[in-house]
Amino acid sequence: SHDIQYRVERAGIKCIVCVGEDYVMEQINDAMQHTPVPVLVSIGPKDAEGFHSWQREWDCVPAFERPFTPNDNSDTMLMYFTSGTSGEPKMVAHDFLYALGHLTTGVFWHNLGEDSLHLTVADTGWGKAVWGKMYGQWFAGAAVFVYDHEKFTAKALLEQISKYRITSFCAPPTVYRFMIHEDFSQFDLSSLHYCTTAGEALNPAVYERFRELTGISL
């Protein structure tokens, strides 16, 4: 709950939208004892006392009308918190041109096009869950594959890539390190054309072994 409390205080949060799971809502309620937030919303599957139901609110919300004066490109669109490797996490603000800047990520780094089906492995606690899955990828016209797993296993991930014919894949080096220990002969990865990595240093041995198994250079 400390992480929630810290971010609420630093950013002046007015609303929290969360997954409706007991642990998450308990942590939020603990933080609210110190830093109350006016509006709490649960997207399900559970609702708790003090939380609005996203679905019920959505069902009765009026149609959106575009404001006469839209946001300016220089207005703040979102704020990330850094990972806090030195001291507490720090806020980093991004304006409305930020998303457009990731056109280069989707088109030139992930190498995506309108026929692409892209999968990025990144938890929603990381900025990459946004810039690695949404902005540049959709600007490129690609479809984004969402794999909601409770526990990561390299075998299950490879099964998804094989079954759904993923064409582009991005994950941290640690994921590739686990993947190369699987039996690649069990999976049809012929749809996979381009793979990228980010987040930490890539061990040369992992790079070479993945290229041997797939013919793809990270």
Residue ranges of each PLM-predicted region?
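Short hydrophobic/charged patches on amphipathic alpha-helices used for structural packing
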Residues: 5, 68, 154-158, 186
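Conserved AMP-binding/adenylation subdomain of ANL enzymes
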Residues: 100-117, 124-167, 182
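Gly/Ser/Thr-rich phosphate-binding loop
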Residues: 139, 166-170, 180-218
